[in-house]
């Protein structure tokens, strides 16, 4: 341990706060919180730890700490520091897991929508639903039963929905606020669990219609009842009080934490969320960090009640999230927490079982690959591939596999700068030169094996740069493809000789993964650049569209095809003034051949 670390550890306060661990570059690599800073920070440098924590501690060269006045303040500060520094050893929950909601818009003539984006607007949101199909089935039923407007833009004449009795046609008729409120109240009643009462009302109306010999109407009502029964059959009751609640459980093993969340809506268990991540804190601290990030995600709507395991400070959760938090001692809620804990434990056991099998395969693969090539085991492999179409936007990509697995933080993209026209060999020279000049300058780890997606010419270009320009002697191999553009074999040596691998061997599968991954990474980067240049050139002739607006449009739509399909309203939504939106729409509509 560094001497200055011992000195800093000796004067740590016994107060709550946050600590920031730093590596030799001064980069914050981990942020944590503690009820007692002195005890928590010292624990990293004493006693035994699992492999993941040992790796973290091995990188710590310095630390800072911030004293707070309470545990709640420490929790809030920790989340803000994680967002600010994005440390590599902290969990950062992504916003890519979203659930559908049904929304009643706050427009003068309201609509029913399905959305995955819960906004702080005046709309009313119901959900989450376990999947899009479930949300669409419920919306379809409500559309049949309640005649809110369906069209996003008001048409000039009545549409088919009016003739089907599913819309009051506010486009041509006056629909009062009272009428809309009555319909919206019925929908809210249904979505809040009042479907039994509504079903009973429909049943009464069906019998009345039948007695009046209105058989078509009776059949419509019978079908609506059948749809209600079908949807409700899929959502079994587990709680009788109809309160919306999220039930949390967790398990910890071998330095990993799994948190399971059960979404209970209107008494029904509709979905669960599973998150797994490495943990370097006490389990309770890790859980609090997780739950803070969980509800920052816009797709996770705070329910009326949050149910947490007995080991968690529910009072702190309640104050932090401003939602009722409970720790059940008995009954149905306690059973649900135990079920969530059990599922989390099973998920971790499955993960470790798969990891053990995967470790065996990958270790065997890289070990065998080294033997086949006559080199030391290549624990770190770096692979290169070029991509261009007819010489436009030439790019290259480098990926890294460490211990037989992709290390995505090590991936690099390169725009070709010095080569004119489509020259694969010179492009490879440039990229290899840039990559390893920087590696030497910044003392970055060098690979045990370099793989080039190409043949003898590519290998010769790479070897020339490494050995004759940079003085590096790193084993390298070329990946040769067959006539179907699939991995065929390796070539290695000077002159290069083929190395044939068994096609069903783990080392061959590893090479396939490397080749597919570097090709995917390169071609994706090329398409991004090509798409940008196509959109930018397509918009060059439109008055009022400069580089800034081009970037906004590119970010919003992603492709020229989507822009050509967009309406004026969608261009306005993307941030364009109405007159500019009209010009873009007119220009792209006229230019059919773009």
From Swiss-Prot:
It is found in: Cytoplasm. Pfam families: GIY-YIG, UVR, UvrC_RNaseH, UvrC_RNaseH_dom. Residues 14-91 form the GIY-YIG domain. Keywords: Cytoplasm, DNA damage, DNA excision, DNA repair, Excision nuclease, SOS response. One of its GO terms (cellular component) is cytoplasm. PROSITE patterns: GIY_YIG, UVR, UVRC. InterPro entries: GIY-YIG_endonuc, GIY-YIG_endonuc_sf, GIY-YIG_UvrC_Cho, RuvA_2-like, UVR_dom, UVR_dom_sf, UvrABC_protein_C, UvrC. Belongs to the UvrC family. The UvrABC repair system catalyzes the recognition and processing of DNA lesions. UvrC both incises the 5' and 3' sides of the lesion. The N-terminal half is responsible for the 3' incision and the C-terminal half is responsible for the 5' incision. This is UvrABC system protein C. The gene is uvrC.
